[in-house]
Amino acid sequence: KGFNEVSEKEVIDFVNQSDNDDLVYYLSDAAYINIKKSDGKKRSVRSDLKEYAKKGIEVLKEQIRFCNPSVILGGDVCYNIIDNLFDWGEELYGGDGYNPVKIYELVIDGKSYPFIDMFHPSRTQNYKDGDEKESMSMYFLELFKAMISVEKARPGYWSSHMNNKCFEASALK
């Protein structure tokens, strides 16, 4: 079996047979947290990110409330950046390895949002499995492995967190 009991073949088969009731659909309502623009620089420094997050935490929370995402994707920002700035529910998935995927529940005003924290997509050129460099497909493979693992452990988890989009008429009634 593969990583966390989910094999690469299972992920590929899953993606190939996806329809609107699958995890690909849930990602279509994802919000990607961008704590700070890097001013055109290639890299951000973690200590700078932490300061930007502290200064902008209320704006960030308000953006999450407004957008009401079904999933939030963070680019490796939990540990030592936003971990003490939000309320957190339980850790749903704790990956391991060079670039681990972690899935938490972030809580704002008593509402829980699945928060997937993994390396930023711009780091895909740096993703290594041993001596072999991986492509962007590896990024999505790791993401789907984690999501499928959560779904196996908690059937119906992802569908239970589908939120109304902020611009849907039904959300305004």
Tell where the protein language model's regions lie, with residue ranges.
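Redox-cofactor binding/interface segments in oxidoreductases and associated redox assembly factors
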Residues: 74
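Acidic catalytic loop of the alpha/beta-hydrolase fold
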Residues: 80
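Structural motif
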Residues: 70-71
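C-terminal capping/extension of enzyme domains
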Residues: 47-61, 83-173
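A polyanion-binding, active-site-adjacent surface
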Residues: 1-67, 77
